[in-house]
Amino acid sequence: MARYIGPVGKISRRLGIGITEKGQRILAKRPFPPGQHGPSARRRQVSDYGLQLLEKQKARYIYGVLERQFRRIFEKAQRFPGETGAYLLILLERRLDNVVYRLGFATTRAQARQLVTHGHITVNGRKTNIPSYTVRVGETIAVRPESRRRMYFKNLVESGALAKHKAPDWLRLNPADLSGEVVAMPRREDAEPGINEQLIVEFYSR
């Protein structure tokens, strides 16, 4: 499945939020949209539709989800009682690639997605190579025993980096075992900050 592999700095500046750590660093240095005239350039006022589109794109790029898949997640969120926007972000948080990232097994969601697709991750002991898999309470996410011998994972444990990692409250991390458990459902406030989900709801409600 195709993924955006372009310059994260340019996208981060266009969206006004760092979609990766690298994007955050670039945005801190150049906190204005890309363009040859720099920060002093006068730009057209963005329409309501433009703001809604921008917010949807922001969430998509942060979580690394393609348009068609993002639309399916939104439609699934609509079936839940309560606030659709909040459930949209909760469903994005429950993606397996995001959980691998939140547990500290990867430094970016793109890397986490790669670990999943390459077969390094198990769910309840079974190899799962689908990044969009939705985790449930009680499930254990771990690095495959065969993969733990790889230098990347050995360094992750031996360097102490994983032991220092702070997983969110809805996940319980076991650094020594390269595993984690889903102990609760994520809440709206557990999602990535800086996303106005109501604008996304308005975009799809046009």
Curated annotation (Swiss-Prot):
One of its GO terms (cellular component) is small ribosomal subunit. GO terms for molecular function: rRNA binding; structural constituent of ribosome. GO terms for biological process: ribosomal small subunit biogenesis; translation. Transmembrane segments: none annotated. Keywords: Ribonucleoprotein, Ribosomal protein, RNA-binding, rRNA-binding. Belongs to the universal ribosomal protein uS4 family. PANTHER family: 30S 40S RIBOSOMAL PROTEIN (PTHR11831), SMALL RIBOSOMAL SUBUNIT PROTEIN US4M (PTHR11831:SF4). One of the primary rRNA binding proteins, it binds directly to 16S rRNA where it nucleates assembly of the body of the 30S subunit. With S5 and S12 plays an important role in translational accuracy. This is Small ribosomal subunit protein uS4.
